Amino acid sequence: MCLGGENYLELTELIFIVVAVVVSLFVGGFIGWLIRKSAAEKLIGSAEEEAKRVIDNAQGAAEAKRREAVIAAKEEVMHIRNEVEKESRERRNEIQRMERRVIQKEESLDRKMESLERKEDNLHRKEEEVDQLKEVLTQTVAKEKQELERVSGLSTEEAKQILLQSVEEEVRYESAIMIKDIETKAKEEAEKRAKNIISLAIQRCAADHVAESTVSVVALPSDEMKGRIIGREGRNIRTLETLTGIDLIIDDTPEAVILSGFDPIRREVARVALEKLIADGRIHPARIEEMVEKSQKEVDQRIREEGEQATFETGVHGLHPEIIRLLGRLKFRTSYGQNVLKHSMEVSHLAGLMAAELGVDVQLAKRAGLLHDLGKAVDHDTEGTHVQIGVDLAKKYKESWEVIHAIEAHHGDVEAKTIEAVLVAAADAVSAARPGARRETLESYIKRLQKLEEIADTYDGVEKSYAIQAGREIRIIVRPDKIDDVLAPKVAREISKRIEDELEYPGQIKVVVIRETRAVDYAK
C-alpha cells in the first residue's frame, strides 16, 4: 500500500508540474502576444503616419503636375487656335483674291462676248454686202465677157487657150531658171569635190608612158649582115617570118633592120631571136628555128616577171598565176599608143588614192583598177569586146563580184552600182585623157572632129560650131533670136547627150554654148 501511495504522489507532482508548465507557457505566450500587439500597434501607427505623409506629398506633387499640365494644355490650345485662325485668315484672303480674279475674268469675258457679238453683226452685214457685190460683179463680168467676145472675135474657150499657153510659157521659163540654178549649184559643188579628189590622186601618182609603135628596129654591126639575114634566095628571112609571123623590112636604112607587126609579143620574140642570131653569127633555117624557140621561152618568162612586178608595184596580192601571166602580156599591148600594163597600173594607183580620200576599200579599188583591162591581153585571139572577155576571165579565176562588176562597168556598158566601180571608171578616164597619154590615127582624129561639128550643127538655132583642143572641146555659136540665156544650158545638155550616145572617145568633151547679141547703129 505504501508503494502504491508513493507512486500516486509522484504522479500527482508530475501532473502538477505539467500543469504548471502549461500554465506558464500559456501565460508567457499571452504576455508575448500582448507585447507584440503593442509593438505592432506602434509600428502600424508610425506606418500610417508615414503613409499619410507620403500621400500628402504625392497629392501635392500631383496637384502641381496637374496644374502644370492644365497650363500647358491651355497654352497648346491657345497656340493651335492662333494657328487655325491665322490659316483661316489666309484662306479667306486667298478666296477673296480668287473671287476678285474670277469677277475680273467674268467681266473680261462679258466684254469679249459683247465685242464678238458686235463683230459677228458686222460680219453678217459685210457678208450681205459681199454677196451683193458678187452678184453685181458676176453680172458685170458676164457683160464684159460678152463685150470682149464681141470686140475680139474670140470665144471664151479660145481666150482660155491663149491664156493657158501664156501661163505655160511663163511657167516653163521660170522652171528653166530654177533648174539652171539648181544644176549650177550642184555642178559647182560636185565639180569642186571631184576636182579636189582627182587632183590629190594625180599629184600623188607619178607614171611615165612610152608611146609604142607597130615596128621594132634591130641594129646591125654592119650592112654586110643584111645579106646573111636574107640568106640564099631569101630562105633565112622567109623562115624567120614564117616562124614569128612578123615582117622583116630590109631597106636602105644603114646598119638597121625593121620588124613590123601588130602583135607586140610576136614582134618581141622576133627581135630577141634576130639579136641572138646576129650575136651568134650562124644564120640558117635550123639555127633560126632554135633561136626562135629560145626567144619564145625568154619572152614567156619575161611576161610572167612583168606581171609579178606589176602586182608588186601596185600592192595587189593573191592573184591567180594565170591572171599574173595575162597582166604580163599587157606589157606588149598598146591602146592608142598607150602601154596597157602601164595604164592599168596607173588606174590602180589613181583608184586606190581616190578610194583613200573617200574612205572606202583601197585594196578592192586597186585590184579592180589593175584588172579592168585584163581582156585586152587576149582580145586578139578571142571573140568579144575586151570588157566581156575581162569579165569572163575574172569569173573563171574566181575574182570577187565587186571586181567583176568594176570591170564590166568601167566603160559604161552597165550602170555602176558600187563606189569602187565608179572610181575605176574615173581613174580610167583620167589616165586615158591625160595629155600625152594616148594618140590616135590622123584619119580617126579628123573624123571625130567632123562628127562633133555635125552633131552640133543639126540643132535648131545653132549658127556655127568649132571643135577645138584636139576634139576635147566644142564651141557652139547660137542665134540670139532663137535661143536665150535660159535655154542655152538646155542646148548644151542635149548636145552633150547626143555626143555621148553617138560618139566613142577617151576622157570627156567640153560643150560650150556661146550666145552673143549685137546692137549696131550708124551715126550720120
Swiss-Prot record:
Subcellular location: Cell membrane
Domain named KH: residues: 214-277
Cited Gene3D superfamilies: Hypothetical protein af1432, K Homology domain, type 1
Topological relation to the membrane, as annotated: Single-pass membrane protein
SMART domains the record matches: HDc (SM00471), KH (SM00322)
InterPro entries xref list: HD/PDEase_dom (IPR003607), HD_domain (IPR006674), HDIG_dom (IPR006675), KH_dom (IPR004087), KH_dom_type_1 (IPR004088), KH_dom_type_1_sf (IPR036612), Ribonuclease_Y (IPR017705), RNase_Y_N (IPR022711)
Presence of the UniProt keyword Transmembrane helix in the record: yes
Domain spans labelled HD: 340-433
Chain segments annotated as transmembrane: 15-35
One GO CC annotation: plasma membrane
An individual GO BP term: mRNA catabolic process
CDD domains: HDc, KH-I_RNaseY
Enzyme class: hydrolase
Classification via SUPFAM superfamilies: Eukaryotic type KH-domain (KH-domain type I) (SSF54791), HD-domain/PDEase-like (SSF109604)
Keyword DNA damage attributed: no
EC number: 3.1.-.-
Pfam families: HD, KH_1, RNase_Y_N
Chief localisation class: membrane
Keywords recorded for this protein, A-Z: Cell membrane, Endonuclease, Hydrolase, Membrane, Nuclease, RNA-binding, Transmembrane, Transmembrane helix
Molecular functions (GO terms): RNA binding; RNA endonuclease activity
Task of the protein: Endoribonuclease that initiates mRNA decay.
Family statement drawn from the similarity comment of this UniProt entry: Belongs to the RNase Y family.
NCBIfam families: HDIG, RNase_Y
Protein name per UniProt: Ribonuclease Y
Gene expressing this chain: rny
